[in-house]
Amino acid sequence: HKEEELLGSSGGPPPEEPPKEGNPAEINVERDEKLIKVLDKLLLYLRIVHSLDYYNTCEYPNEDEMPNRCGIIHVRGPMPPNRISHGEVLEWQKTFEEKLTPLLSVRESLSEEEAQKMGRKDTEQEVEKFVTSNTQELGKDKWLCPLSGKKFKGPEFVRKHIFNKHAEKIEEVKKEVAFFNNFLTDAKRPALPEMKPAQPPGPAQILPPGLTPGLPYPHQTPQGLMPYGQPALPIFGYGAGAVRPAVPTGGPPYPHGPYGAGRGNYDAFRGQGGYPGKPRNRMVRGDPRAIVEYRDLDAPDDVDFF
């Protein structure tokens, strides 16, 4: 009965009619395990050699800078649980090919003139260099082939010996030349970025440590903008004499007087005479790591002790 049902000659369901125009047919997605293994090898080759992630339709141009090289690869999604229409398959193929076309298109290589300027090698010349470097003169009518250690009466015999007995060495030279030329003419060859020399900062750009352009006062600078390991600078004039840069800058240290840069001393930021209009804050302390300075108890009380 099953055969009759398949043939449609018996009481089974009628044979399926071909889809009418405008109604796409539904199809089942099938998997071929042998073809999938071949496909996976090709996709892995694209990923490892060309940094091309096929299923994500993207390329990783700066893979050498990534934490884990070849650490990202997208794989096939799960099989669709339901039957899909033929139109959906065609639409998916069209969209996928449009995304892959820019990645798989052949890029222009260097012209012969540009390649010559960049050091393109000639196969025949490189072979001649190899033969010449392996033809050593020991004395009159005595020549040596260092590849085999045999001696000959003339350089022409050494040359013939190399081509006959060491043909594999000649092929290695040709392969090296082809590899070098292919690398040279590859528009996507890896190369170090061009480093532009940094312009020395002008006088107006030199700021004390902890000061950021656009933020004139240290107490207005967010702590997140301070260099790592460097304490926040105090408010102008209060404990400034005890501040030292966390990293040596090569310049002279901040000037400090015998009384901790009080009102009568020169301050590196505000000049002499104090910062007008700001009330003194007795709770603000200087750098806790500052050097303990000697204070003369007989000296006039010029600073506030806290």
Swiss-Prot record:
It comes from the Eukaryota. Residues 1-28, 251-284 are annotated as: Disordered. One of its GO terms (cellular component) is cytoplasm. The modification Omega-N-methylarginine is found at residues 263, 270, 280. Disulfide bonds: none annotated. The modification Phosphothreonine is found at residue 101. The modification Phosphoserine is found at residue 109. Keywords: Activator, Cytoplasm, Methylation, Nucleus, Phosphoprotein, RNA-mediated gene silencing, Transcription, Transcription regulation. The keyword Membrane does not apply. It is found in: Nucleus, Nucleoplasm; Cytoplasm. Pfam families: ARS2. The keyword Phosphoprotein applies. GO terms for biological process: neuronal stem cell population maintenance; primary miRNA processing; regulation of DNA-templated transcription. GO terms for molecular function: DNA binding. Belongs to the ARS2 family. Acts as a mediator between the cap-binding complex (CBC) and the primary microRNAs (miRNAs) processing machinery during cell proliferation. Contributes to the stability and delivery of capped primary miRNA transcripts to the primary miRNA processing complex containing DGCR8 and DROSHA, thereby playing a role in RNA-mediated gene silencing (RNAi) by miRNAs. Binds capped RNAs (m7GpppG-capped RNA); however interaction is probably mediated via its interaction with NCBP1/CBP80 component of the CBC complex. Involved in cell cycle progression at S phase. Interacts with CASP8AP2, ERBB4, NCBP1/CBP80 and DROSHA. Interacts with LUZP4. Interacts with NCBP2/CBP20 and NCBP3. This is Serrate RNA effector molecule homolog.
